Amino acid sequence: MSTPAIPQDLQLNPSQRTQSAFREQRRQKLKEHLLKRKTSFACKQENQMLLSDGDQRVRTSEGQIQEGKKVLKIKTEMADKENVGRPTGIKNNLTVEKNCIPLKPSNELTNSTLATDPPNSEDNNQTLPLLPVKDDPQSQHRTLSQTFHLKNNSKKKPVITEKPKHDANVPKKPVLGAYRGQIVQSKINSFRKPLQVKDESSATTKKLPATVSKATKPQPGDVSSITVKSDRASHMTSTTKFASTTSQIRHLVRPPIRSQHNKAQDAMKPGNSRMSANVTVQKGPREKELNTVLSGIKTSSSQDIKGDKTLSKSMAAGMVVRPASSSNTKLIEKSKSAGQRSHTTVKAAVDSRWTQPKETAEERKARLSEWKAGKGRILKRPPSSAVTRPEPETQNEQPVGSFWTTMAEEDEQRLFTEKVNKTFSECLNLINEPIEEMRHTIVDILTRKSQEKLKFGENIEETSAAEEKIQEAHTDDTGVDLESGKLEMENNPPRNVFQDCEKEQDDKVKDPTSDVKTPSTNTRAGCLIKYNVSTTPYLQSVKKKMQFDETNSAYKELKFLTPVRRSRRLQEKTSKLPDMLKDHYPCVSSLEQLTELGCETDAFVCRPNTALCGMFSEPDPTEEE
């Protein structure tokens, strides 16, 4: 079977890869890639060999660079539309290779150890040996300018490290009279009087223990060795100053005393600077440290003494032209006293610096008060105690008067509290143990009330007997009696509920048929009326108000009596009900039940219930013991 012919619309254009130009281009690319790998491999091998030797520099072969240039020319001549941006990238890569390969060993200057002496550090044009290090990954990408700066920095480092560290023993607080590390005699003379010292050697020996203790102070653990610093520079400056002063004195025939004194002060400055030089010792045993420190201090002190002697000799030689007078001797004495003062000031500064930590808080306060007194900052107080003597007397008189007034107030308060406590105790005793007189009064009140009720019942019987004895007429008579009783309740002052309760009981005893004709006749026969005994917060507040009234002081509690309707059937079964379903407040139907509840000393207020009969519709508050 033959393959079907593809229509012209669906045929693809012939690929450009089949063309000879593109094949040649791909062949050149492959050759370039292989050459690149070959050169990189050769460079790696050379680097490894140079690192193992440690003394040879890495150099690139000129043949490899020429081959790279040829490949670059071929790339630029080819016009490839698909790879327009490629030649520039390859060119950059080749230039990076060309620049970075010969400069590889120059970056080891940072990690190389250079052993150079300070005298030889002046030769800036000397070439330093290069020690290649494997640990520096950035060494492969450094330019010529970077290597040049690294060389200069490496040459400057030893010079910087050899500079003396003057900050090691400089005190934290500035020394009085010092200017730029040197003590100026003119500043000292402005605020300090010259101290009398026998000779200079005694001052230097006194300064010895302070410097020894400072030199033997423990250094940090990582410091391996400390170099002893020399005073060559200071000696040179001192000699030059001596020469200049002597020459000036010889030229002047009659120099003024002021200028000579200033020159003597200038000549003493190098000696002072020598005394304040730092003396440090190499790490070792304590005995060696002490010996070296002692020797250094002795040499410096002897040099100072020699300098002072030469100064005095030169001054004397310069003044030979002028006739001998007392001014020359005064000048020499002044120069000596200036030297002695400089030594004593250095010693005083050192001593004060070492004695400050031992000072206690009390000494500081005393020193502060003295300083304030010197400055005139003390609080002004009365000048004499004689003026202030009468003041305590007046102050004592005032408390005496206030004492008697407070005593009187305390007595009044005590009497008042005793009276109040007495009244409270009497009230409590009356509540707990009532007096017989009170009981008799209560009984009299109850009997009088009962007699009134009996009379009221007899009147009812007389009226009922006068009327017809028919049952209907009897019922009419009872209705009239009830209406008349209602009118009496409206017209008369409010009465106690106990009267109503006793009246009901009397009616029940005298006429058993009257139960049907009570106000509860309107309700069903299965219900009965009782009085609920309850209290409210309002009653408690009323009771507190009533306690202040003497007439009602006998009442213990104040409660409400409210008529309520209860079911007979449920009342019979209340004993079987749980406590949750029972009434929280007790209900009574007679005076005897109230006495059983222990409410003999309570006062009751009748609260009407509008849901029941009309007789309870109007509020009739009554109170009774």
Swiss-Prot record:
Q: Which domain of life is it from?
A: Eukaryota
UniProt biased composition (Polar residues): 1-22, 107-128
Report if keyword Cell cycle is assigned.
Answer: yes
Task: Enumerate the UniProt keywords alphabetically.
Answer: Apoptosis, Cell cycle, Cytoplasm, Cytoskeleton, Microtubule, Phosphoprotein
Q: Which GO terms describe its biological process?
A: apoptotic process; negative regulation of microtubule depolymerization
Q: Under the cellular component aspect of Gene Ontology, which terms does the record hold?
A: cytoplasm; microtubule; microtubule cytoskeleton
| Pfam families the record matches | CKAP2_C
Q: What InterPro entries is this protein classified in?
A: CKAP2_C, CKAP2_fam
Entry annotated with the keyword Phosphoprotein? yes
Q: In this chain, where does the modification Phosphoserine occur?
A: 190, 534, 541
Q: Which residues carry this modification: Phosphotyrosine?
A: 538
Where does this protein have compositionally biased stretches of type Basic and acidic residues? 159-170, 359-373, 500-514
Location of region: Disordered: 1-27, 104-138, 153-173, 195-237, 259-282, 322-398, 484-521
Question: What stretch or stretches form a coiled coil here?
Answer: none
Subcellular localization, as worded in the UniProt entry = Cytoplasm, Cytoskeleton
SUBUNIT field: Associates with alpha- and beta-tubulins.
Q: What does this protein do?
A: Possesses microtubule stabilizing properties. Involved in regulating aneuploidy, cell cycling, and cell death in a p53/TP53-dependent manner.
Family to which the UniProt record says this protein belongs: Belongs to the CKAP2 family.
Q: What is this protein called?
A: Cytoskeleton-associated protein 2
The uppermost taxa in this organism's lineage are: Eukaryota, Metazoa, Chordata, Craniata, Vertebrata
| Gene label | CKAP2
